Structures are given as C-alpha cells and as structure tokens.
Amino acid sequence: MAKKITGYIKLQIPAGKANPSPPIGPALGQHGVNIMEFCKAFNAKTQADEGTITPVVITVYADRSFSFITKTPPVPVLIKKTIGIESGSSVPNKNKVGKLTKAQVEEIAKKKMPDLNAASVEAAMRTVEGTARSMGVDIVE
C-alpha cells in the first residue's frame, strides 16, 4: 500500500548549500521531517551545480519520511548566468542590462523544457524571451 502523504513543501535552495538554518529548518521542522537527513541528501544530489538556485518539491509522508524532486533552475537565474549579470534592470523598459541571442534563448528553453508547460521548443523560447524582456535584456538575432 502507498504511504499517506501529509504535505508538500516547495523551496528554492542554492544547490549543494542546504543547511538547517532558516528558511529550510522551519519549513521542514513544522512537518516533522528530519532536517539534517534532507540537507545531506539534497547536497549530495545537487553538488554538481554548486551555488545555482534549485527549486525542490519535498513530499512529506505520514510516517515523517520524505522524498524530493529537484527541478531546473528558474529562467531568470539561467538568463543571468548566461549573460553574466548580477541582477536584472530595475526599469526594464528604459535601462537595458544585456543582450541574448536566439541561440542562447533556445539553449535556455531546451534546458528548462521539462519544467515548462510549453508544447514545443518555440513556445518555451517565447516564454524565455518574455522573461528576458521583463528583466531588461534585449533579444538579438
């Protein structure tokens, strides 16, 4: 028989850097999850992408055990990493902070495809382009 699920916890944690301090500790503690066990498992699974923000969905079961699924980094994180900027523009319609080529957009879209609800790579590219524009990044051919 399947285990009874008591809850889901969604967090965005830097890969390889999970520790029991807030926000991770309190979020897991209120569900009765062994915090250190999660931190060790998460860090082991994500050590290759050290430092990149990684969304994780933790499923908590009635017997206080857990399982988790890591997702691909958020699109803004991938865009910032690709063009090497610290943050997006505070006024994206006036100040542009960088440029992305169509090839770079396609690369980001393909990397993000499993987590997007886009039907095709072209649709995923439009999603990535929209995010880039809202960050003050120009799309060039």
Swiss-Prot record:
Single annotated GO MF: structural constituent of ribosome
Domain of life where this protein originates: Bacteria
Matching InterPro entries: Ribosomal_uL11, Ribosomal_uL11_bac-typ, Ribosomal_uL11_C, Ribosomal_uL11_C_sf, Ribosomal_uL11_CS, Ribosomal_uL11_N, Ribosomal_uL11_N_sf
UniProt xrefs under SMART domains: RL11
Keyword Protein biosynthesis: no
SUPFAM superfamilies: Ribosomal L11/L12e N-terminal domain, Ribosomal protein L11, C-terminal domain
GO cellular component terms attached to this protein's record: cytosolic large ribosomal subunit
CDD domains: Ribosomal_L11
Keyword rRNA-binding among UniProt keywords: yes
Free-text description of this protein's post-translational modifications in UniProt: One or more lysine residues are methylated.
Gene3D superfamilies: Ribosomal protein L11, C-terminal domain, Ribosomal protein L11/L12, N-terminal domain
Pfam families: Ribosomal_L11, Ribosomal_L11_N
Keyword terms: Methylation, Ribonucleoprotein, Ribosomal protein, RNA-binding, rRNA-binding
Any one of the GO BP annotations: translation
Function: Forms part of the ribosomal stalk which helps the ribosome interact with GTP-bound translation factors.
Subunit and interaction comment: Part of the ribosomal stalk of the 50S ribosomal subunit. Interacts with L10 and the large rRNA to form the base of the stalk. L10 forms an elongated spine to which L12 dimers bind in a sequential fashion forming a multimeric L10(L12)X complex.
Similarity comment: family membership: Belongs to the universal ribosomal protein uL11 family.
PANTHER family in the record: 60S RIBOSOMAL PROTEIN L12, LARGE RIBOSOMAL SUBUNIT PROTEIN UL11M
Record-given protein name: Large ribosomal subunit protein uL11
Organism in which the protein naturally occurs: Trichlorobacter lovleyi (strain ATCC BAA-1151 / DSM 17278 / SZ) (Geobacter lovleyi)
